[in-house]
């Protein structure tokens, strides 16, 4: 069965594809929250160091941002990392433009003919 050749259908498909690419471009961060050990009123971070509540720190080796939070249930480390991006064959990944999160995250670029 041949794909539809109606020009309006083709334009609508490309418009939907372009919209989805814009949405995917903006959804780059994956955020996870982990309960963490605490010591002296501070979080023991993934890096093994002590971090005060609301402190923000980075791991430039894995392009991530970390925050220590404390609520009435305990201490947590919030970790933000780049997400895996799924993209069509006519697109490709470009390296991030910086060394620190989120600028180090890859971006998808597409060339529409």
UniProtKB/Swiss-Prot annotation:
Q: Cellular component GO terms, alphabetically?
A: extracellular region
In the record, what terms sit under GO molecular function?
Answer: toxin activity
Domain of life, per UniProt, equals Eukaryota
User: What the entry says about post-translational processing?
Assistant: Contains 4 disulfide bonds.
What InterPro entries does the annotation carry? SVWC_dom (IPR029277)
Expression across tissues is: Expressed by the venom gland.
Its subcellular locations are: Secreted
- Predominant subcellular localization, coarse grouping: secreted
Tell me which positions the record assigns to the signal sequence: 1-29
Q: Keywords of this protein's UniProt record, alphabetized? A: Disulfide bond, Secreted, Signal, Toxin
Asked whether the keyword Aminoacyl-tRNA synthetase is assigned, the reply is no
Q: Which family does it belong to?
A: Belongs to the scoloptoxin-16 family.
This protein is called: U-scoloptoxin(16)-Sa1a
Organism equals Scolopendra alternans (Florida Keys giant centipede)
């Amino acid at each position: 069965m041949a794909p539809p050749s109606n020009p309006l259908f083709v334009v609508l498909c490309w418009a939907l594809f372009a919209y989805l690419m814009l949405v995917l471009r903006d959804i780059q961060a994956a955020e996870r929250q982990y309960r963490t050990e605490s010591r002296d009123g501070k979080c023991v971070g993934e890096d093994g160091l002590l971090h005060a509540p609301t402190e923000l720190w980075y791991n430039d080796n894995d392009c991530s941002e970390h925050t220590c939070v404390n609520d009435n249930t305990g201490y947590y480390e919030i970790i933000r990392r780049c997400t895996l991006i799924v993209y069509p064959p006519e697109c490709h990944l470009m390296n991030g433009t910086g060394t620190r999160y989120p600028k180090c995250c890859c971006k998808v670029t597409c060339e529409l003919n």
